[in-house]
Amino acid sequence: MSQRVSDQVMADVIAETRSNSSSHRHGGGGGGDDTTSLPYMHKVGTPPKQTLFQEIKHSFNETFFPDKPFGKFKDQSGFRKLELGLQYIFPILEWGRHYDLKKFRGDFIAGLTIASLCIPQDLAYAKLANLDPWYGLYSSFVAPLVYAFMGTSRDIAIGPVAVVSLLLGTLLSNEISNTKSHDYLRLAFTATFFAGVTQMLLGVCRLGFLIDFLSHAAIVGFMAGAAITIGLQQLKGLLGISNNNFTKKTDIISVMRSVWTHVHHGWNWETILIGLSFLIFLLITKYIAKKNKKLFWVSAISPMISVIVSTFFVYITRADKRGVSIVKHIKSGVNPSSANEIFFHGKYLGAGVRVGVVAGLVALTEAIAIGRTFAAMKDYALDGNKEMVAMGTMNIVGSLSSCYVTTGSFSRSAVNYMAGCKTAVSNIVMSIVVLLTLLVITPLFKYTPNAVLASIIIAAVVNLVNIEAMVLLWKIDKFDFVACMGAFFGVIFKSVEIGLLIAVAISFAKILLQVTRPRTAVLGKLPGTSVYRNIQQYPKAAQIPGMLIIRVDSAIYFSNSNYIKERILRWLIDEGAQRTESELPEIQHLITEMSPVPDIDTSGIHAFEELYKTLQKREVQLILANPGPVVIEKLHASKLTELIGEDKIFLTVADAVATYGPKTAAF
């Protein structure tokens, strides 16, 4: 909106502009203005010319090696380089030198605590992936050991998680409907192998920035939708409905239809009583832990207590004889090798790769988000690329030892943090406890009711529905809220993979929208200063008579150059019409503030050439203010500076206004 000011106010603005311009003159004025009274103005600097090799090297290093990982190898002996290399691959060799009994005490307690949480969760999560319960325990034995040696997070707890288990189970069952077949198990190992390969390649190739394309808003919606889907899937276990009679679909309509269809002939009242009783118990313990952080352990051990008590109850009452579904047999012993089970050829190889890539990316996104959260809380650095290599290695090794896709668990990591863990040794302690469970305790889980495992899963995923985050998204960014809701409804009304696809699509759509439709703003001068700001943000900022100042707030590339040119011309037409209506001087100079423009390509240069020619026809002079080093170098290389005129490129907007603005005497 044009600033309507009286002649006296305009004179004051112009006088302030000239008195406050602290820069120095760099060339003659334009339009016949007398600029001999102006002081010298600094020219816009041009960076030293770089060779093509130097430009490529700089761009490559900034993209893939911004943290300069090889800097510490410089000027070191061969043995020292080997030592540093091993420490880089296995961080435990670096921080392990300073490990002491005090740290071990904290890690030992934390490891025991998360083990009590992970064992019942592992049994339950394996069922989400349509696998036998012992594969969950296998996965919590091998993967944490590998991560402890290669990971950089001190707090993350590794193992199967609900969302990835559900995603894996859904995608695998789309390929092989008979989840009890041996090929289904082999495909699970194959997907795990390629999930690990995907994660490792991202880390080795330094492509970790790719996972940032999935926005936080989309993740919030996807996780919430997945949590509800997981909860709905547990109704069959909670109500005692047979797997053979329950729908294989995951959308809310199909699940609820299946639930109500079996209300008279499928529900088992004893199962419902057991399931609801322990679900209420688990939710109460979570509430207690949330209200009093010192009692976090109450929530951590409640799943194990639920398993022990319910197993004993079913055993002494023989409730399994009256329709209460139980776990039955669980294999004991250490993980058997599965290297010869992976599909490296054949008709299921392509399916294994597809499922593995998707599951690997989702698992990696969740792990990195968790790792960054706790790293920020404890103020230490998390190396994203090392994390990817560690995650990839543990899933590759896991696929060869009867494990399915594992990642960082938020609930277990939170307990690990609250229990006082100091290093990744807590994962080793947890792994040893799981090993002892596999060797000694697994036969005792025979009478564990499936309803309790369903209750454990429901209680675990409740926190994934983050209402507060959704409300905050609505308040801050409506587009982010749409992305969140799109992913959420895609999961609960269609399927997990459709919800994930919607989340990715909306995230990319937002990026494309921001790139192709960047923000521009009309600037005005703040009273009493030489500062120019957005007139919508600062209504008192006064526009300069006869001048239009526009700021472009993004890089100018082929994807947005035409839009920026047309938007600037629309600003010119709209502002010109308003000023004519207000009987203000016509616009004679268009100043483009380019401070926020980090780069420009050939399409952007061409757009400015067209803009210049259009403005010439309208008898409006184009002026550029403060182009950055990359931009000014390209302007010189394209000879656009010669077309516009060296005297029309300024260090600041204030310099441009002081040189080409109307004289106070004219008013």
From Swiss-Prot:
Keywords: Membrane, Transmembrane, Transmembrane helix, Transport. It holds the Pfam family Sulfate_transp. Residues 16-38 are annotated as: Disordered. InterPro entries: S04_transporter_CS, SLC26A/SulP_dom, SLC26A/SulP_fam, STAS_dom, STAS_dom_sf. One of its GO terms (molecular function) is secondary active sulfate transmembrane transporter activity. The chain crosses the membrane at residues 106-126, 131-151, 156-176, 185-205, 208-228, 269-289, 296-316, 350-370, 425-445, 452-472, 486-506. Residues 537-660 form the STAS domain. The keyword Transmembrane applies. The keyword Transmembrane applies. It is a multi-pass membrane protein. It is found in: Membrane. High-affinity H(+)/sulfate cotransporter that mediates the uptake of sulfate by plant roots from low concentrations of sulfate in the soil solution. Belongs to the SLC26A/SulP transporter (TC 2.A.53) family. This is High affinity sulfate transporter 1. It comes from Stylosanthes hamata. The gene is ST1.
